[in-house]
Amino acid sequence: MDVSDKWLAEKSFFCDNDIMVLPKLTEIYFEEKKYSLTYYLADLYQNDFLSLLFYKMLSLSVLGKKKAAFKIYESHGDDWLNICKQYNIYWKHVILFALYFKQKRYSDWFQNLLNRHYDSELVQLFELIEEYSQEKFVQLPLFNKICEEYPSLKKFYMPLKSKNSPITFEKVLWRVWGKYNHKLRDMPLDKNKMQCLYNKDGLKIFSYKPHQVAASMHIIFDHDATIIFDCGAELVEDGIKHIPARQILEDLNINKVDAVFISHGHLDHYGSLNELPRSPCFMTEETASIIKMTSTNIFLRNLQVKNFYDTVNVGGIKIKFIPNGHIRGSVLFDIDWRGKRIIYTGDYCLADQHTCLGLDINSLLTIPKRTDIFLTESTYGKKPQMLSLKQYESIFVDICEAVIKFGKKIIIPSFAVGRAAEVALLLKESARRNGFIILIDGLAAQMTEYYQNSMEKNIIGGNISVYTGDIDLRYRIDNYNVIIASSGMLQEGSTSFFYLQEMLDMDKVCVLKVGFIREYEDMLISILNRRDKNVTFFDIPLSAHADYDTLISITEKISPETAIYIHGQGIEA
């Protein structure tokens, strides 16, 4: 493939917003083995081009997403080879598709394709499919050689192993939570949106179900003790909505809260702490520092700071702090509740980030006692096609480089806590290598300075600056290639809001959404109305949550008696 073809295709798409070149661009990226980027771009406009649906299916296959790939395959079944012919799909990719999906010799066109490229090892391997049983085929040296380049091919040929998994619909609330998504009244809610998730042997778990964004509060209690895990707030259209914790406790006939444990320093997990002023409040030192910096209206009374792996004893109930990889200072809680083991994950991530290490699952598996209740987040539980955080990070850097190459300014609305520093570090090496410069502004600038000092890590400097308050807004826009600004949700009056007010009328602007923004946010609506005109817009999820595959695999590894999916919309079974 000609290098000039790639340059022209990238310019047309990333600079001129011309989607007609996407079929060619995805072909080029797939051949360059940029499978995550291929999938991402193909997914954007799959309804406009059948060839993009083909590359979405093929990239999912190579990435090992077998079920998602087969779901697309079944949409056109035996017609895929005709689609390849109609859209002139690159021959090598046609053969690879035929290998993954075990195609037969349906047409003269396909047979001629095989004949023309018989010197290719892909073709030679395909020719052997009908000569060997599947058991012998996967033992061929040529098959294993091809699998070195395409490891996921083995998954498509190996029979599914039956496993005696303890995770069944009878033991797991998957089915309940799946239904809950579609019909709000499938599980009873009281007037304060509290939901009884568990009631057995005198132990009860109630969880708050928020209006839109998932604010967390989970009450675990028995006849002798009540402990609350997280007490967050919701960002709603007209501001912040606090959880009515005191009223909820009164409705549940709870007179005393023995302790409150906060998993991490995001508003949806601590924003209603003022509702519980008398209870001892436990969190890590890093979480306490983050809350003090970002929320001056939160009063941390009765604060007790703990370190990773510390254990707190509350009336005979033991709660252990285990780092969980979401942001700096974040933890899950491993609870021994009078002989019952409960794990409350908070928000968690297995992948290492620049600013914190991922959850070490072995820290949970080495404890011999079986988990009775696994209370886990499910932010991405309804997105089985979702890629991993590392794959989205790769997509993010690739798109930034492509956009900047053609002279566009990039604005990245970002959460101040953790995400801004993480985004800056993702781009740091690329900025040095490609010569573009980055400005961090708003509360994100203060938090990035805090992260730099607390981590002793070089974030600021070189090609990355933080705004110090003495430079005109227009000057900042004109003299920086990338601007990272809070708030991540584009709230009116925020730093990111003011930047976009100025930038949306410019000719070459790219908005990169890397976290949650409410659909009704006026600025987001303005951005989307200009999309594919003067504004380029990409939505690349970089929040450090457990992806769908992780949610399933972690549950299977922990093998609890009961798994409850919270803080999201359940999980797609």
What residues fall within each predicted segment?
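Alpha-helical repeat scaffolds
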Residues: 3-12, 36-45, 66-81, 104-117, ...
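"A position-specific structural signal for the A-helix of alpha-solenoid helical repeats
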Residues: 24, 55, 93-96, 126, ...
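Structural motif corresponding to the intra-repeat A-B loop/turn of tetratricopeptide repeats
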Residues: 32, 63, 101-103, 134
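C-terminal regulatory/interaction regions
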Residues: 174-176, 180, 184, 190, ...
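Metallo-beta-lactamase
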Residues: 184-199, 286-330, 337, 453-479
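Pre-active-site segment of Zn-dependent metallo-hydrolases
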Residues: 210-215, 219-262, 271-274, 283-301, ...
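Catalytic core of the metallo-beta-lactamase
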Residues: 213-218, 222, 310-369
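Hard-cation-handling environments
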Residues: 397-512, 566
